[in-house]
From Swiss-Prot:
InterPro entries: ARFGAP/RecO, DNA_rep/recomb_RecO_N, NA-bd_OB-fold, RecO, RecO_C. One of its GO terms (biological process) is double-strand break repair. This is DNA repair protein RecO. GO terms for cellular component: bacterial nucleoid. The gene is recO. It comes from Wolbachia sp. subsp. Drosophila simulans (strain wRi).
Length: 240
């Protein structure tokens, strides 16, 4: 069995002295793993977030298989000196590695992840909004879309200030004030991102509020369901 595709590196682990187990998020084949050979000059090629042209081959589809890779675009060197950006990229790559089903195409998420890498690489000031959008999209693509369009109790679309941790639905200030200590906040940044307003800039504290909300649902719907530990790097984004 053999196929060719483009893919983004989401994990790379040494296997012996001369091989690497590579995990790619590919455009048409989803998350795929395979062995690839290391050479003296190939380490730079296999950095998280780099874009590769990959040829995968194996006797059977369920085998680990082998990758032959050519570098299309190197990305990690653009932001590795920025601690927050590098942690964000590595963290999301780790999330994809842990929660994406094997061999199931997810072209919408792939295209958005590739676009996000370009956004963060070119120092777009709204990259944090694009990142929250990426986490919301991941939840949606895996079947856990949040409904933040209107109040779950009254149906109103104004003054949405809370999110129910049980349902992932928005709650208005009037309906939720009495239960505020049992609800998640609905930060303005996340409200704008949900409504596809991605060009605004916000404080880092506002970004962290958004991360707490999306992180809660990533953990609840994906990691706990898979019995997988939530990535420490993702938690680190809240303490920088």
């Amino acid at each position: 069995m053999r196929w060719k595709d483009e893919g983004i590196i989401i994990a790379a682990k040494k296997y012996g002295d001369k091989n690497l187990i590579l995990s790619l998020f590919t455009k048409n084949h989803g998350k795929r793993r395979g062995l690839t050979k290391l050479t003296n000059n190939s380490n730079y090629k296999f950095q998280i977030s780099n874009l590769l042209h990959a040829e995968w081959s194996a006797k059977l589809p369920e085998n680990l298989g082998f990758f032959k890779c050519e570098l299309i675009e190197s990305s990690f060197h653009h932001f590795f000196q920025d601690r927050l950006k590098s942690i964000t990229i590595v963290s999301f790559s780790s999330i994809l590695e842990k929660v994406l089903p094997e061999s199931e195409p997810c072209a919408v998420l792939y295209d958005n992840f590739r676009y996000f890498i370009d956004v963060i690489k070119h120092n777009n000031q709204s990259w944090q909004s694009h990142y929250l959008n990426l986490e919301l999209l991941l939840l949606t693509q895996l079947g856990f879309k949040l409904d933040l369009s209107k109040c779950a109790v009254t149906g109103v679309k104004e003054n949405l200030q809370f999110i129910s941790p049980k349902t992932g639905r928005a709650v208005s200030k009037k309906a939720g004030d009495y239960y505020a200590d049992k609800l998640l906040p609905f930060p303005q940044m996340l409200h704008d991102v949900y409504n596809n307003n991605l060009q605004n800039s916000y404080s880092f504290q506002e970004f962290q509020l958004g991360l707490k909300v999306t992180g809660y649902f990533l953990n609840k719907y994906l990691f706990l369901q898979l019995n997988v530990k939530f990535p420490e790097l993702r938690n680190l984004m809240l303490s920088l």
